Amino acid sequence: MSRIGIFYGSSSGVTGKVAEKLAELLGEERCDLYNMEEDFVDFDDMLKYDHLLFGCSTWGSGEVQNDWRDPLLELDNEKPDFSGKTIALFGAGDYVSHGEQFVSALGVLYDKFKARGAALVGSFPTDGYTYEYSFAVRDGKFVGLPFDKINEVDKTDERLERWIAVLQEEFLPA
């Protein structure tokens, strides 16, 4: 059974908790968790997996979470090849305080890793979300799973279960 690498940045712990929940739902025995601040060394950590989940919250006016900033600069400079890798994205946002850039960091990750050859899967419907704008919306869907653990905590578990069903079809290795 092929392993899944789950890489996440989490300033307040929210994205980390969702990463742990995803590992539980996908089967902890097949998942390796990497906190970008504590565990990430270089892209070889990611490239050893064919299937990856990246978790990143959005801060301020659409910026990626701090732990992703340097690795994304390195991605641009080193240009590692992610061809043959399948990536799904998830991330926290706050539609009340930052509805003008709701989970836009996912759009940044999407563009960066797509440009490096990765196949990105796991898009999620925008239905049921309230926001003004999101850079993470492409072709009418979010590029990954957005969640708002501040204003919509009651919807997170149901959305996770729906996203797992999407991943069962598009992502999960045999």
From Swiss-Prot:
Domain Flavodoxin-like: 4-168
Protein keywords: Electron transport, Flavoprotein, FMN, Transport
Induction statement: Is the predominant flavodoxin expressed when A.vinelandii is grown on nitrate as nitrogen source.
Cited InterPro entries: Flavodoxin, Flavodoxin/NO_synth, Flavodoxin_CS, Flavodoxin_lc, Flavoprotein-like_sf
Keyword Metal-binding part of the UniProt annotation: no
Record-level Gene Ontology MF annotations: electron transfer activity; FMN binding; oxidoreductase activity, acting on NAD(P)H, quinone or similar compound as acceptor
Family: Belongs to the flavodoxin family.
NCBIfam families found in the cross-reference section: flav_long, PRK09267.1-5
Described function: Flavodoxins are low-potential electron donors to a number of redox enzymes. AvFld 1 is able to donate electrons to the assimilatory nitrate reductase of A.vinelandii to catalyze the reduction of nitrate to nitrite.
Protein name: Flavodoxin 1
